[in-house]
């Protein structure tokens, strides 16, 4: 398999939005080819966090991660942050070469900030570039609002990645059309 042009998609769920304070509680990855065809779905890992960390989550995170069942999966998880990083890297190395794929997803800079602090080996696996679907979303909302993609965010990492890939496919078909 030619790994050079594969795209690595990632999503994290966190205890909050502060990359210097909050923790990762779920990680998922998907690998696509350059045409956005899914090649493989990586492990979806709930990352154990102790009760004092979970208790610090704000009401929004408590509500959404509680309703999805993620908080309970975090409590029951046998994976710490380093183990989740190692398992994710082991999966990705089968489909991409270090430094080749941009990090892909929605609002991916936020995920990258968390990876930089908490999973630095995984963050270093990616090219320095980002493929951030939310940038395209913001431009489409302003320039082509009739083509805006509406999605139901589940705040479950794997489904959020699938939705991001679907969103980019949508924009590819409607905005990034072949000019010839």
Swiss-Prot record:
The record's InterPro entries line, in alphabetical order, gives:
Exonuclease_RNaseT/DNA_pol3, Oligoribonuclease, RNaseH-like_sf, RNaseH_sf
Please tell me the species this chain comes from: Dichelobacter nodosus (strain VCS1703A)
Q: Which GO terms describe its biological process?
A: DNA metabolic process
* Database matches in Gene3D superfamilies: Ribonuclease H-like superfamily/Ribonuclease H
Chief location: cytoplasm
Please verify whether the record's keywords include Cytoplasm.
yes
Q: Where in the cell is it found?
A: Cytoplasm
GO cellular component annotations of the record: cytoplasm
List the CDD domains hit by this protein, alphabetically.
Orn
Where are the catalytic residues?
128
Gene that produces this protein: orn
The UniProt entry, under HAMAP family, shows: Oligoribonuclease
Purpose: 3'-to-5' exoribonuclease specific for small oligoribonucleotides.
SMART domains from the UniProt entry: EXOIII
**Name used for this protein in its record:** Oligoribonuclease
Q: Does the keyword Hydrolase apply?
A: yes
- Organism superkingdom: Bacteria
User: What are its E.C. numbers?
Assistant: 3.1.15.-
């Amino acid at each position: 398999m030619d790994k050079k042009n594969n795209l690595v998609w990632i999503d994290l769920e966190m205890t909050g939005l502060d990359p210097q304070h909050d923790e990762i509680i779920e990680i998922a990855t998907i690998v696509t080819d350059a045409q956005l065809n899914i090649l493989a779905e990586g492990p979806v890992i709930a990352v154990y966090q102790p009760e004092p960390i979970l208790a610090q989550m704000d009401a929004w995170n408590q509500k959404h991660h509680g309703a999805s069942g993620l908080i309970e999966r975090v409590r029951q998880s046998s994976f710490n942050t380093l183990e989740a990083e190692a398992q994710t890297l082991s999966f990705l190395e089968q489909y991409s070469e270090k430094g080749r794929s941009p990090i892909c997803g929605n609002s991916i800079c936020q995920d990258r900030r968390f990876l930089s602090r908490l999973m630095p080996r995984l963050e270093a696996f990616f090219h320095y570039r980002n493929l951030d679907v939310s940038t395209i979303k913001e431009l489409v909302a302003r320039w082509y609002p009739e083509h805006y993609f509406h999605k139901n965010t589940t705040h479950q990492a794997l489904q959020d990645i699938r939705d991001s890939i679907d969103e980019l496919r949508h924009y590819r078909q409607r905005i990034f059309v072949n000019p010839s």
